[in-house]
From Swiss-Prot:
InterPro entries: Histone-fold, Histone_H2A, Histone_H2A/H2B/H3, Histone_H2A_C, Histone_H2A_CS. The nucleosome is a histone octamer containing two molecules each of H2A, H2B, H3 and H4 assembled in one H3-H4 heterotetramer and two H2A-H2B heterodimers. The octamer wraps approximately 147 bp of DNA. H2A or its variant H2AF/Z forms a heterodimer with H2B. It is found in: Nucleus; Chromosome. The keyword Transferase does not apply. GO terms for cellular component: nucleosome; nucleus. There is a cross-link at K119 (Glycyl lysine isopeptide (Lys-Gly) (interchain with G-Cter in ubiquitin)). This is Histone H2A.V. Variant histone H2A which replaces conventional H2A in a subset of nucleosomes. Nucleosomes wrap and compact DNA into chromatin, limiting DNA accessibility to the cellular machineries which require DNA as a template. Histones thereby play a central role in transcription regulation, DNA repair, DNA replication and chromosomal stability. DNA accessibility is regulated via a complex set of post-translational modifications of histones, also called histone code, and nucleosome remodeling. May be involved in the formation of constitutive heterochromatin. PANTHER family: HISTONE H2A (PTHR23430). Keywords: Acetylation, Chromosome, DNA-binding, Isopeptide bond, Nucleosome core, Nucleus, Ubl conjugation. One of its GO terms (biological process) is heterochromatin formation. Gene3D superfamilies: Histone, subunit A. The keyword Disulfide bond does not apply.
Length: 125
């Protein structure tokens, strides 16, 4: 078996499942967490972890991209909870997906239409 195949060359370098999938998020760790959380005695398909990692990575990249743009608009180099809040609430799809309250996120600027007076009438009073 193994001895015949391996003889003459060194053992192959280990390649992580994240690297195989071309992801930054840890596929192995996500797989372990999925196994720990399931009721069916830790039976989780191999591709389930890869797919989950890809989804989490995409969503994280999306939020960070928008938050980075928000911080750039305000001419600062550091992303704060405020920038995350502005990014998430500014995007319709992310807003519907992430309904959690962001600590230190502040509020979204909004003035109701009826409260904004007309330019002409404001000068008269």
């Amino acid at each position: 078996g193994k001895a015949g195949k391996d003889s003459g060359k060194a053992k192959a370098k280990a390649v992580s499942r994240s690297a195989r999938a071309g992801l930054q998020f840890p596929v192995g760790r996500i797989h372990r967490h999925l196994k720990n959380r399931t009721t069916s005695h830790g039976r989780v398909g191999a591709t389930a972890a890869v797919y989950s990692a890809a989804i989490l990575e995409y969503l994280t990249a999306e939020v960070l991209e928008l938050a980075g743009n928000a911080s750039k608009d305000l001419k600062v180099k550091r992303i704060t909870p405020r920038h995350l809040q502005l990014a998430i609430r500014g995007d319709e799809e992310l807003d519907s997906l992430i309904k959690a309250t962001i600590a230190g996120g502040g509020v979204i600027p909004h003035i109701h239409k009826s409260l904004i007076g007309k330019k002409g009438s404001q000068k008269a009073t």
